[in-house]
Each structure stands twice: as structure tokens, then as C-alpha cells.
Amino acid sequence: MLFGTYEHCMDAKQRLTLPAKLRNKLSNPIYLTKGFEADLEIWSKDDFLLQIKEHLNKISDQKDIRDLERIIWSNTVEIGIDNLGRIKIPYNLIQSLNIEKDVFILGLGNRLEIWSKNKYNQHKKELLKENS
């Protein structure tokens, strides 16, 4: 199980070191994809495929299924964790989500989320405001 919040920095080569507690629970390859919010998600292969099936099963319209498949598959890359526990995040994913050097890595049970530090702080503030 993946859990916790970790603050990390991407290096100049767009590599991000995953916390040891989290990377020890993941095995290569892993899947990096755009989340449904302003984040990136990291999945194991089995959990990623299961999640896609669940999303697609909730949709009855064939066009909507194709549209969701396009979004998911075209924004997903298979990556590996190197010997130092780093992943390389493709530039197009960083750019499309405006992810900055400073990030939060969130463990959310079966996946990780990577958020720009500023965006996550703003998102968290909005959530707390909505629930107070």
C-alpha cells in the first residue's frame, strides 16, 4: 500500500527521486499518466489496467469510451525506476501540467500522485474551504 505525503525536487534533467518507502513497493515497469486533475499519476501495470477497465465500464456511450481512451492512452508512458530510485518525467507531461521543480508526491493506496507544490497547496486550500 502506498501512502504519505513527500516533498521532493526534480533535477535539471527532469528526474524525480521517489521516496524509498514508496519505490520499494513498486516494480518496473511503472506507468506515468496525466491524472484527472492538475497532477501526474504513477501506477503499477496491474493496477493501471484495472483502473482503466473500471473507468471504461462506467461509460455506456461508445464515443465517450473512445474519447476517454484517447485521453488516457495518449498521455501515458511506460517508465522505469533507475538504480538511484529516480524516474524521468517526459517534458510534454511536465509542460502540459505546468509542473515545477518543487513537487509533492502523494501515496494514495494503489497509486502515487505528483503535484506541483504550488498547485497542490492551492488545491488543498480549496478543499479545506469547501469542507469547512
UniProtKB/Swiss-Prot annotation:
Assigned keywords, A-Z: Cytoplasm, DNA-binding, Repeat, Transcription, Transcription regulation
A single Pfam family it belongs to is: MraZ
Q: From the UniProt record, which GO molecular function terms apply?
A: DNA-binding transcription factor activity; transcription cis-regulatory region binding
| Entry keyword annotation includes Kinase | no
Q: Name one GO biological process term.
A: negative regulation of DNA-templated transcription initiation
**SpoVT-AbrB domain: residues covered:** 5-47, 76-119
Check the record and name the SUPFAM superfamilies matching this protein. AbrB/MazE/MraZ-like
Entries under Gene3D superfamilies matching the protein? Transcriptional regulator MraZ domain
Chief subcellular location: cytoplasm
* Subunit structure of this chain's protein: Forms oligomers.
- Which family is annotated? Belongs to the MraZ family.
Q: What is the protein name stated in its UniProt record? A: Transcriptional regulator MraZ
> Which species is listed as the source?
Mycoplasma capricolum subsp. capricolum (strain California kid / ATCC 27343 / NCTC 10154)
At the highest ranks, the source species' classification is: Bacteria, Bacillati, Mycoplasmatota, Mollicutes, Mycoplasmataceae
Gene giving rise to this polypeptide: mraZ
